[in-house]
């Protein structure tokens, strides 16, 4: 019980310290057209295809430049692993945890193919243009829920992969470049909608 209390206290402290700084992302979003994608499930990277289509249609059908569009993708739940680096997928067996298989090896996925897919990976529409990295270059902002990281850490501890506190710190320290960790997905979505972001669950 003491260890669990210590872990929860550590998570609370991290959240408290980072809450103000983690809201800095709100000031980066200047586009007139604003869309938030709520993503609790990996679903083969369907959201990445939706985001790409969203940007493409604004440009091709309406002539709107990407600088005038702001897109947020909020990752939590089973989609939490999408926000961390390959090293974490291998170390904590994240592919096995969400039942994903590497098409190149037929073994549980040990890399984040949503971030940087290889040829043949079943992500989005199967092209690099649907990768997280490509969408980030187009201005898309990915948010990662700290609460979800905490729940994943507790789950991985039960699998004998370390203590929850150590795992939580490791996952936070290996978020994908450009991914912003927020205290809670639900609060981030509320803050975005208060700033006129349309909402869609994807």
Predicted regions and their residues:
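A glycine-rich helix N-cap at a beta->alpha junction
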Residues: 93-118
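Histidine-anchored nucleotide/phosphate-binding helix
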Residues: 46-64
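Acidic helix-start/capping segments at beta-turn-to-alpha-helix junctions
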Residues: 64-88
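Acidic/histidine-rich, surface-exposed loop or edge segments in extracytoplasmic proteins
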Residues: 27-42
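Solvent-exposed loop/turn segments at secondary-structure junctions
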Residues: 42-44, 77-82, 142, 147-152, ...
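N-terminal secretory signal peptides and thylakoid transit peptides that target proteins
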Residues: 1-15
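Loop/turn elements at helix/coil->beta-strand transitions in domains of secreted/extracellular proteins
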Residues: 32, 67-71, 137-141, 195-198
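Glycine-rich, aromatic-bearing surface loops/beta-hairpins
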Residues: 157-202
